[in-house]
Structures are given as C-alpha cells and as structure tokens.
Amino acid sequence: MASTVSAYKEKMKELSVLSLICSCFYSQPHPNTIYQYGDMEVKQLDKRASGQSFEVILKSPSDLSPESPVLSSPPKRKDASLEELQKRLEAAEERRKTQEAQVLKQLAERREHEREVLHKALEENNNFSRLAEEKLNYKMELSKEIREAHLAALRERLREKELHAAEVRRNKEQREEMSG
C-alpha cells in the first residue's frame, strides 16, 4: 500500500510536469484526454484559470495480469500406475508405523522415568523415616538412662537420710537410757 501511494505521488509529479509541457505546445487540450501510466489512468476533467482537475484511476492488482505471473493450479501429474500407488501406500503405512513406534517408545521412556522418580522418592522417604526413628529411639534411650540415674540418685539420698535418721534415733535412745 505504501509503495502504491509513493508511486502515485511520483506519477502526479510527472503528470504536472507533463501537463505543463503539453500546455506549452497545445493551447487547447483534447476533450476527455486520457493518459495511461503503468498501473494508473488519468483523465483530465476540467481546465480553469485557477488550475486543472484530473481523475486518477488506479488499476486493481488483478488488472495487472500481463506484468505479474498468473497464479494457476499446479501442473497436473500424469496418472500414477497401480504399482506406484501401492508403493506410496506402503511408504505411508511404514511412516505411520515408525511414528507410532516412536510415540510408544517415548511413552515407555516417560513411564520408566516416572517409575524411577517414584522409586527414588519412596527410598528417600524410607531412609528419612528410618533415620527419624533411630534418632527418636536414641533420644528415648538417653532420656530413660538419665531418668534411671536420677531415680537411683534419689533412692541413694533417701537411703542415706533413713540411715542418718536411724542413727539419730539410736543416739537419742542411748541418751535416754543413760539419763534415765
């Protein structure tokens, strides 16, 4: 479109110069003078003291058929023989089978990858669970040992207090016997 507009502007410049030159040679232009420039047709409508008026008609691209190649249907092939058709069908079937095998292979690879990922996730989960259980068991054993040691210390102190209390009672009884 831009090229058409620029071509139009160029033609209009050429037309004004041409009109000026023609007006020098011919004082009166022919009525309904038609000028053709490539893809444009120019008709002179009016000539006045204030200027001239023109009608510019742009041809459609379909009218330019001699200059541009005509788009036609592709050249027809000669009739293919039965053997050629059979070969083409076999080749198409082979391509289809190859493509189907490739798709199945990709699906199998994807499933295998999913299986591997799932197996790895389960293995990591089992390892985590086992480590967490071992850590918990260790903490429980440690807590149990600390508790038993604390209870043993309490029992030892209680036994010592009882021994001390028994000694104090014996001493008191001996004093009472001696004094009384």
Swiss-Prot record:
Post-translational modification: N-terminal palmitoylation promotes specific anchoring to the cytosolic leaflet of Golgi membranes and subsequent vesicular trafficking along dendrites and axons. Neuronal Stathmins are substrates for palmitoyltransferases ZDHHC3, ZDHHC7 and ZDHHC15.
Residue ranges of every copy of the SLD domain listed in the record: 38-180
Pfam families found in the cross-reference section: Stathmin
Cytoplasm found in the keyword field: yes
Region (Disordered) location: 60-81
Chief location bin: Golgi
A GO cellular component annotation in the UniProt record: Golgi apparatus
InterPro entries from the UniProt entry: Stathmin_CS, Stathmin_fam, Stathmin_sf
Keyword Disulfide bond: no
Alphabetized PANTHER family for the sequence: STATHMIN, STATHMIN-3
Subunit annotation: Interacts with STAT3. Interacts with CLU (secreted form); this interaction may act as an important modulator during neuronal differentiation.
Family: Belongs to the stathmin family.
Name of the protein in its database record: Stathmin-3
Organism: Mus musculus
Taxonomic lineage from the root: Eukaryota, Metazoa, Chordata, Craniata, Vertebrata
